Amino acid sequence: MDPRSEVILRQQDYLKGRVLLINAPNDALVSQLPTEIDASVWTWNYADYQVFLNAGATAHFSVEFPLQEFDQAIIFVPKSKELLNYILHVVMSHLKIDQSVFLVGEKKGGVERAAKQLQSFGKILKLDSARHCQLWHLKIEKTEKIKPLESWLKTYTVQVNEQELTICALPGVFSQTHLDVGTAVLLPYLNQVKSGRIADFGCGAGIISCYLAKANSSNIIHALDIDAFALQSTEMTFSRNGIGSDQLRLQPVTGIADAPTELDAIVSNPPFHQGIHTNYDASEGLCQNAKKHLKASGELWIVANRFLNYPILIEKHFGQCEIKTDLQGFKVLYACA
């Protein structure tokens, strides 16, 4: 069990009524809480959401606070400070004065910094500190009026092959405020991608998806991501750039196995972070299984850190892998099914 969940179980006497667990790990915590606790989970991680559903838990997959009332909330500290600001805002705009909010996190995950953010809403008390985790309690003294989701957007422009795109990114989304180096290295090659039905695996704020849709109005883009905030950001990016929703298919996925089949191309700057931890499962799975989702002669385009062994993995499953460029620590890899 996650050590943060163990802290919650140790201090379960503080819990009562309808309790919302926000960003909780997908372990056995919910099933081990006392039966008198009416626990629900709010997550934006689609893989976690599936685990909660399969375990019979009441779970919500969304960027927005669930549409019901709660007596308490437990926030598992996210990696992003901006995302925590958003979560605190929506919690304080749904809960009432004198209700309880708990904050739990790992020291290396920034729980002490997060506790300072919590102080804006009342006096806080540290309830537990063990196994490199801390649990803080707040009795709400100040609530907030909900702001529209759009007010949390960060926008920036990107120039790609004579096209200027406006990128919209919500809190917690990869490269929320600027173009990342890996995607920048890949972008000049996107005009070579085969047209048709194209999947953007790990779409993030929708930079790749948006360019491919604008480059050819007959392209259908399947924007795939595990994160609800990424999918929402991609939808907002399309809207901001005047691209019709008929070109966009948004799909939450747990990995490449959930992707559509018979695709003309898969393009990806694959994700490798899960919370504060590095995880290459999704990107390695992409290299190994992408071919199953492509038509004959369909294309795989990936940008990845040069130290990763993706060319070998791709060659093993496609029979070949071409390195299009090796620049600023990143390689653009190409394979044809």
UniProtKB/Swiss-Prot annotation:
It is found in: Cytoplasm. The gene is rsmC. One of its GO terms (cellular component) is cytoplasm. It comes from Acinetobacter baumannii (strain SDF). The keyword Cytoplasm applies. Belongs to the methyltransferase superfamily. RsmC family. Keywords: Cytoplasm, Methyltransferase, rRNA processing, S-adenosyl-L-methionine, Transferase. It catalyses: guanosine(1207) in 16S rRNA + S-adenosyl-L-methionine = N(2)-methylguanosine(1207) in 16S rRNA + S-adenosyl-L-homocysteine + H(+). This is Ribosomal RNA small subunit methyltransferase C. GO terms for molecular function: 16S rRNA (guanine(1207)-N(2))-methyltransferase activity; nucleic acid binding. Monomer. The keyword Phosphoprotein does not apply. Pfam families: MTS (PF05175), MTS_N (PF08468). InterPro entries: DNA_methylase_N6_adenine_CS, Mtase_sm_N, rRNA_ssu_MeTfrase_C, RsmC/RlmG, SAM-dependent_MTases_sf, Small_mtfrase_dom. Its EC number is 2.1.1.172. It comes from the Bacteria. Specifically methylates the guanine in position 1207 of 16S rRNA in the 30S particle.
